[in-house]
Amino acid sequence: MAFRGIVVLASALFVQSALSQCVGRAGPGLGGYRGGWDGFGYDGLGYDGAGYGWNGRLGCGGLGDDIAAASALGASHGGTLAVVTSSAAPTGLGIASENSYEGGVGICGNLPFLSTASIAGELRTGGTGGIDYGCGNGAVGITVESVISPAINYAPAGAPLGRSFNRGCGCGAANPY
């Protein structure tokens, strides 16, 4: 009888731990007030409990605090369950080009599942450049190549503009890009 009780208790603990993982950063602070770093603080309604918003998206963090398209895509973060990743290189589909392009180049296509895009090689000493990558909608496009960052940082999928500092309303740490 004691064994059955232990099995029921262990099952309840496993279910509770699986269902009590982080639900995402879109909610308005579901935990109780515990200072500035939990509940209504760091992940909730305000930075340090002062109402500025960090990941709660009601203030300085804004909607651009993470990739807007990927935050709603369950495959990119595991939904409500924790995701464990490794540093092993992915295997499968790989696309590489050893070509040199001059002038205007137009590339169109879709890659399946979640993937990455990168450019490597020598860039001009002047000019602009970048990669426009939409996670989850299949849109990958090299838009521009740049050495100098633009004055306005563009966010994907309808996220608000950041004015060369962090995201959202433009306050926070300096832009590392």
Swiss-Prot record:
GO terms for molecular function: structural constituent of egg chorion. One of its GO terms (biological process) is chorion-containing eggshell formation. The keyword Ribosomal protein does not apply. Pfam families: Chorion_1 (PF01723). It comes from the Eukaryota. Coiled coil: none annotated. The keyword Nucleotide-binding does not apply. One of its GO terms (cellular component) is egg chorion. Keywords: Repeat, Signal. This protein is one of many from the eggshell of the silk moth. Belongs to the chorion protein family. This is Chorion protein ERB.1.
